[in-house]
Amino acid sequence: MAKIQLVAQANLPTEYGIFKMVGFEFPDTKKEHVALVMGDISNADEPVLARIHSECLTGDALHSLKCDCGFQLATALKQIQEEGRGVLIYHREEGRGIGLINKIRAYSLQDKGMDTIEANLALGFKADERNFEVCADMFELLGVKKVRLMTNNPEKVETMKKAGINVVERVPLNVGENRYNTKYLDTKAKKMGHYIVHNNDEQHLMTCPHCQEEII
């Protein structure tokens, strides 16, 4: 398969400031990915605050509380805005790579008691079908060699390092925990090795508006 190519770019004003939206495409499959770039990232020797964010329609656009994705996306963009410089790669691998419809099927199995890993396996998929190597190629096309990577996922860090991207710091992104996703976060920590810091202490439960909602 041919490597991904940078094919388009334009300014994108957002509530977090003006980003340059950069489009990438595989020439053979036409599979698309996107990056949002803020500020001057041309100095390859200066680490760039970065986030690899896998597509999550339910969390990012529909404000689902079943995961922490939407909260992580908003927090990452806000932190880049505060820094004045950074890159967010929007990795278009919905549902950890199984696609939106299969993600809904997995949610149905979770409604019946399975955790997020068990549901994927029951549908015939691996726990995580994503390929993060393409993200390293996108960083290279942007001229980014060193990153401070906002993630709780050790696989993203290791994949970037193996691909030649120098991850000088892992920046934790523990946000958005609520009563609907605590089990999901716990599963990611215990079964996938994610660096999850739980917020489910008494003070959090008493002050978080999501945790005060009626349990469905």
Curated annotation (Swiss-Prot):
Listed NCBIfam families: PRK00393.1, ribA
Gene name for this UniProt entry: ribA
Matches recorded under InterPro entries: GTP_cyclohydro_II (IPR032677), RibA (IPR000926), RibA-like_sf (IPR036144)
GO biological-process terms attached to the record: riboflavin biosynthetic process
Keyword Nuclease included in the entry's annotation: no
Superkingdom of origin organism: Bacteria
Name listed for the protein in its UniProt record: GTP cyclohydrolase-2
Similarity comment: family membership: Belongs to the GTP cyclohydrolase II family.
EC number: 3.5.4.25
Pathway the protein takes part in: Cofactor biosynthesis; riboflavin biosynthesis; 5-amino-6-(D-ribitylamino)uracil from GTP: step 1/4
